[in-house]
């Protein structure tokens, strides 16, 4: 078979003991000595070095086949076994079995194969670019449709919402005649403008501003100086002291003027302590309402038939099954501290807090408060 010259991809010519085979997307080299297929030229080069000692000039004796090598030194190396085998180096470029035309054909085949691979790669790249362009076009079309739909919906809403919105206040409010006349004139002008415009859409809002006409001033208080004091049952009117009334009818008009002056001074003098008493009673009522003895709300029946007591302090709204528990809970809302410590000035809302204070601060155990809690 000889030494074929193989043209590699890097345009280097090698003389090797093998045959170059090209098929589809790959090529391989078949060793002529052992018929082993190798994928790359480097592997084939290593194979002939390690297995057949090609570069070392030693031809193995186990090669049974008569090779048609074009080297006389190889024939001498393959002599009978009784003769001494001399190490003769083998020349690489000595055989010229394959002509230059065949080498050109092999080179052309390799170039054609590389060109085909490049074309396939270019085609794949073009297909990928086309797919990307199609996807981008689809996205653009979808966005355009969405924008168009949004514009149409906004236009429809504007067309449907166009018109004149008239907001009229309730008739129970008192309006002056001038405001009513002005509002009627504005409504008539708006209606005339809308009829003249025709297809022109406009949003007009007319507000009837209501003005509360102040009523007549209250009458002045009565001349007699009567003091009003709050009582448990209601309001009582106390007449002035009889000594301050003075003589009536004897002095004529002059006497009446003097009596009026004396009455005004007496009313100013007596009004101050009476007002102080009224303020003290109001504070007492406020304290009673803030204390824990305030009247609780009545029991409320639930769906399951049970009666619950609800705390009516502010927005608390907690429910209790027993009234005593609810009264104990109301101490939380109260500002009153009924339980005072005998050892210091501390005070507490609940007796348990006082007991804890005595145990921690004064080391007193088992001593209860002498103060009796208020009965609910």
From Swiss-Prot:
The keyword Transmembrane does not apply. GO terms for molecular function: DNA-binding transcription factor activity, RNA polymerase II-specific; RNA polymerase II cis-regulatory region sequence-specific DNA binding; zinc ion binding. InterPro entries: Znf_C2H2_sf, Znf_C2H2_type. One of its GO terms (cellular component) is nucleus. A zinc finger (C2H2-type) spans 29-52, 309-333, 339-362. Its main location: nucleus. Keywords: DNA-binding, Metal-binding, Nucleus, Repeat, Transcription, Transcription regulation, Zinc, Zinc-finger. Residues 143-165, 213-250 are annotated as: Disordered. Residues 214-224 have a biased composition (Pro residues). It is found in: Nucleus. GO terms for biological process: regulation of transcription by RNA polymerase II. Residues 149-163 have a biased composition (Low complexity). PROSITE patterns: ZINC_FINGER_C2H2_1, ZINC_FINGER_C2H2_2. May be a transcription factor for genes having (A+T) stretches in their promoter and/or enhancer regions. Binds to AT rich DNA. PANTHER family: KRUEPPEL-LIKE TRANSCRIPTION FACTOR, KRUPPEL-LIKE FACTOR 15. This is AT-rich binding protein. The gene is ATbp.
């Amino acid at each position: 078979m000889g030494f074929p010259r193989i043209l590699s991809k890097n345009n280097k010519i090698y003389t090797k003991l093998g045959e170059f085979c090209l098929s589809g997307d790959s090529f391989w080299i078949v060793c002529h000595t052992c018929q082993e297929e190798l994928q790359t030229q480097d592997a084939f080069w290593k194979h002939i070095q390690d297995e057949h000692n090609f570069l070392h000039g030693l031809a193995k004796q186990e090669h049974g086949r008569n090779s048609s090598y074009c080297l006389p030194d190889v024939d001498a190396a393959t002599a009978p076994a009784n003769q001494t085998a001399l190490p003769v180096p083998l020349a690489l470029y000595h055989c010229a079995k394959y002509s230059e035309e065949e080498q050109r054909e092999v080179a052309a085949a390799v170039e054609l194969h590389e060109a085909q691979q490049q074309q396939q790669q270019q085609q794949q790249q073009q297909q990928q670019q086309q797919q990307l362009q199609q996807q981008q076009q689809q996205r653009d079309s979808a966005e355009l449709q969405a924008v168009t739909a949004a514009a149409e919906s906004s236009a429809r809403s504007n067309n449907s919402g166009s018109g004149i919105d008239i907001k009229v206040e309730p008739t129970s409010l008192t309006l002056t005649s001038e405001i009513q006349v002005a509002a009627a004139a504005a409504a008539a002008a708006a209606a005339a403008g809308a009829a003249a415009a025709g297809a022109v859409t406009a949003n007009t809002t007319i507000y009837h501003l209501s003005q509360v006409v102040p009523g007549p001033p209250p009458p002045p208080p009565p001349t007699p100086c009567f003091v009003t004091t709050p009582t448990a049952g209601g309001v009582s009117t106390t007449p002035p002291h009889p000594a301050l009334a003075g003589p009536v009818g004897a002095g004529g008009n002059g006497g009446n003027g003097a009596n009026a002056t004396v009455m005004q001074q007496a009313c100013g003098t007596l009004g101050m302590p009476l007002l102080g008493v009224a303020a003290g009673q109001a504070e007492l009522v406020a304290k009673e309402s803030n204390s824990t003895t305030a009247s609780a709300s009545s029991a409320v029946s639930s769906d399951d038939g049970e009666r619950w007591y609800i705390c009516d302090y502010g927005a608390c709204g907690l429910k209790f099954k027993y009234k005593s528990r609810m009264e104990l809970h109301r101490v939380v809302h109260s500002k009153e501290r009924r339980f005072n410590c005998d050892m210091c000035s501390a005070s507490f809302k609940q007796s348990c807090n006082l007991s804890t204070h005595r145990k921690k601060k004064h080391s007193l155990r088992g001593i209860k408060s002498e103060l009796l809690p208020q009965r609910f």
